Curated annotation (Swiss-Prot):
Its main location: membrane. HAMAP family: ATP_synth_beta_bact. This is ATP synthase subunit beta. It comes from Haemophilus ducreyi (strain 35000HP / ATCC 700724). Produces ATP from ADP in the presence of a proton gradient across the membrane. The catalytic sites are hosted primarily by the beta subunits. It holds the Pfam family ATP-synt_ab. GO terms for molecular function: ATP binding; ATP hydrolysis activity; proton-transporting ATP synthase activity, rotational mechanism. GO terms for cellular component: plasma membrane; proton-transporting ATP synthase complex. SMART domains: AAA. Transmembrane segments: none annotated. It catalyses: ATP + H2O + 4 H(+)(in) = ADP + phosphate + 5 H(+)(out).
Amino acid sequence: MATGKIVQIIGAVIDVEFPQDAVPKVYDALKVESGLTLEVQQQLGGGLVRCIALGTSDGLKRGLKVENTGNPIQVPVGTKTLGRIMNVLGEPIDEKGPIGEEARWDIHRAAPSYEEQSNSTELLETGIKVIDLICPFAKGGKVGLFGGAGVGKTVNMMELIRNIAIEHSGYSVFAGVGERTREGNDFYHEMTDSNVLDKVSLVYGQMNEPPGNRLRVALTGLTMAEKFRDEGRDVLFFVDNIYRYTLAGTEVSALLGRMPSAVGYQPTLAEEMGVLQERITSTKTGSITSVQAVYVPADDLTDPSPATTFAHLDSTVVLSRNIASLGIYPAVDPLDSTSRQLDPLVVGEEHYNVARGVQGTLQRYKELKDIIAILGMDELSEDDKLVVSRARKIERFLSQPFFVAEVFTGSPGKYVSLKDTIRGFKGILEGEFDHIPEQAFYMAGSIDEVVERASKM
């Protein structure tokens, strides 16, 4: 392959000169003689290409030889990546020796064509009551997990990985984009303790790494997920955090000298997001279901980054600090969370009516809270007292002990089937369990467990 030399270094941006007849293509990976990998971003003319460094540019100097690999970055894919931690280039960073890949795929790939895509809306049962009832996931759908610090985004993610790995024998890929190294480390140990590490591939581009790494690490993880999908599997693809993917794009864009757009974001924000999201899709062979943690800067949902993410999501799971402060986990807000799948044509009339009934009861309770705070429960009508009693039972029944949180709760985790979830909430709404005290509903699995618990009270 052609050889060039470094002519300019500006931080993470490196200009390389090649012979006029052998200029690398955009997105080609170049290898510097020091071992650093560069990715071509722009062709400047006259044999010059502008690249972004996928690693620290410390110690580079002008005149160093650069070789064109002739391909985009290629990463290992297949079952050998399971249970391993890799960086953006697919190199192992867990000190467990080489990966021994079955194949290597380019990280820049075209999204599946219209003919290949599958349009069935099959539900993915997660075993988590509040998600299955209020904001059901679709196989091959995209889910946004919105929440502040400490309300349980990571624990929810780990429970989903665990449930799908064990109950559906599915594989998961976790891309830590701009992660804190400590969080990545915690996640690895949690997965090991839950015995699901052999079903998860972990790809990390930590906070301290150059913007090129953080921008590409989501694509590396996605490429590994696509390989599993093309083998006919149903894969889960987790991204934490999609906001930091956007932020890395902003840094790269500024370094390349592009004119910034609204709020200083890159002018190509929608395109970059689209390139990633359009590849996360189901084909007739298998599905990729993605769960993306979304940080909302300054709680402003109209900020260009979350606003661009919203356009691609099928379900939004909103985690609420108020619910977490009541000790109800998972702290999903049933009134704020939405799903495109909550439609009688998709989930059926019974599921739809129960979910809307639950939301209606909780909404009425929310309206009555002010009256209760001022005048007390005694001033309510009999009907309203019944609504409050049922709403409080529903609130508590939406909590659930997680398998990955057994060390915190001290109670064994529960997986609740969708059928049991609907039966339980339907019974509460119809007054079947009005005689059972509300504390019996807290941190329970199915409704049978609640009845059994109440009989011992």
